[in-house]
Amino acid sequence: MNYESLIFDIDGTLWDSRALVAEGYNIQLNKEGLSRYCITAETLKPLFGRVMTEIADVLFADFPEKERYALMARCMETENRHLHENPCHIGYPGVRETMEELAKTHRLFIVSNSQQGYPELCISKLGLTGCITGHLCFGDTGTSKGKTIRALMEKYHITSCAYIGDTQGDY
């Protein structure tokens, strides 16, 4: 089937940001005197693909819910800054070239379980600004990936699409 639009996941599909995300979290945790929490790329591996509140529930389970989510929000702010400032290339080989080719015949979109600002960072860091028609994330909708995809489809009047992701939870 020929699809009019293609919707992409970010983490594990377009890039691998786990190491930089872990660094960003640790910067914030150390700043707050919480160095006993040492987040690694391996710590994040089974958590990527989940919504941010679920990640906070796992990483910071010993905090009361309100404090846990506030800490997670601060970690995500630091993560976004760290990703933005770090010159490291974390995109998978050939992603930009592939997306440029696909954009010639399809409208391309991004959907993520991430916080606001993360899709924009991905688009910018990978040089995809001219390729991506639009994006939505958990931070925009506060809901599941499936519902976020549906919201994106409605917003951009998408009638025929394929979703490309890397985990079963993406589908």
Which role fits each region the language model picked out?
Residues 3, 105-106, 132-133:
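Short, well-ordered alpha-helix to beta-strand connector turns
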Residues 13, 112-114:
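Conserved phosphate-coupling serine/threonine residues in phosphotransfer and NTP-handling enzymes
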Residues 38-41, 92, 96, 143-146, ...:
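Structural motif corresponding to alpha-helix initiation and N-cap regions
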Residues 109, 116-162, 168-171:
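Substrate-recognition "cap/lid" segment bordering the active-site pocket of phosphatases
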